[in-house]
Amino acid sequence: MATPHINAKDGAFAETVLMPGDPLRAQLIAETFLEGAELVTNVRNVFGYTGTYKGKRLSVMAHGMGIPSASIYTTELIKDYGVKNIIRIGSCGAVTPDIKLRELFVAMGASTDSKVNRMRFNDHDYAAIADYTLLRTVVDTAAEQGKKVTVGNVFSADLFYGVQPNMLDVLSKLQVNVIEMELAGIYSVAAQYGARAVGILTVSDIIPTGEATSAEERQTSFRDMMEVALDAAIKL
């Protein structure tokens, strides 16, 4: 049945859903890679599609920007539509220049400046981590495709603008490699409701140097990330 934010019918989603932030990237993935892709939800222009990839039924749906938006969509997919596996595919900014532009990054753990996980966890710190089986599947799939990935930790920031002074130094010292805006929420939602989640990201910015990809490139390219995510998804 429909939820406040998803108007799909029961059974409309596959057990595994790839989730970019951008609805247009979801549309691109569905139209480029999925056979028989059907638009199953479009509330607020947040598109969700279901089709098949190499014979396996898969879905792709956008989650928007930030932990609150991503948490809404992942919660409803898991609780109301029976989704078992979430693979976030998105972009991130590298904290240090040793991680290169367009490199693939798999998020093992997610720190955050958001309070949402403390609210879930009786005001204590929660270790938001990827499901190991999904993480290993993504890493192995990348290796099979001959694609280099870095596995490490992300910082899920509430603010896109306004990073605290010296924050990059703190993150680097504590081995937090990249910044994004959703995974600390997605990982905790998946754990709370008994699902599994992992994030595979493409480095779109090198924060200390100012190197960056264009908005168009972030929407329409990053094909390596998509191929790894799709080929990992059909193994689940």
Swiss-Prot record:
Short name of one Pfam family: PNP_UDP_1
Annotated Gene Ontology cellular component terms: cytosol
Positions that bind phosphate: 21, 25, 44, 88-91
Sites marked Important for catalytic activity: 218
Active site: 205 (proton donor)
The enzyme's E.C. designation: 2.4.2.1
Residues bound to a purine D-ribonucleoside: 5, 180-182, 204-205
InterPro entries (UniProt xref): DeoD-type, Nucleoside_phosphorylase_d, Nucleoside_phosphorylase_sf
Transmembrane regions listed in the UniProt entry: none
BP terms from Gene Ontology: purine nucleoside catabolic process
Recorded superkingdom: Bacteria
Catalytic activity field: a purine D-ribonucleoside + phosphate = a purine nucleobase + alpha-D-ribose 1-phosphate; a purine 2'-deoxy-D-ribonucleoside + phosphate = a purine nucleobase + 2-deoxy-alpha-D-ribose 1-phosphate
Keywords: Glycosyltransferase, Transferase
GO MF, one example: purine-nucleoside phosphorylase activity
Similarity remark: Belongs to the PNP/UDP phosphorylase family.
Role, per record: Catalyzes the reversible phosphorolytic breakdown of the N-glycosidic bond in the beta-(deoxy)ribonucleoside molecules, with the formation of the corresponding free purine bases and pentose-1-phosphate.
Subunit-structure text: Homohexamer; trimer of homodimers.
Name of the protein this chain belongs to: Purine nucleoside phosphorylase DeoD-type
Species per Swiss-Prot/TrEMBL record: Chromobacterium violaceum (strain ATCC 12472 / DSM 30191 / JCM 1249 / CCUG 213 / NBRC 12614 / NCIMB 9131 / NCTC 9757 / MK)
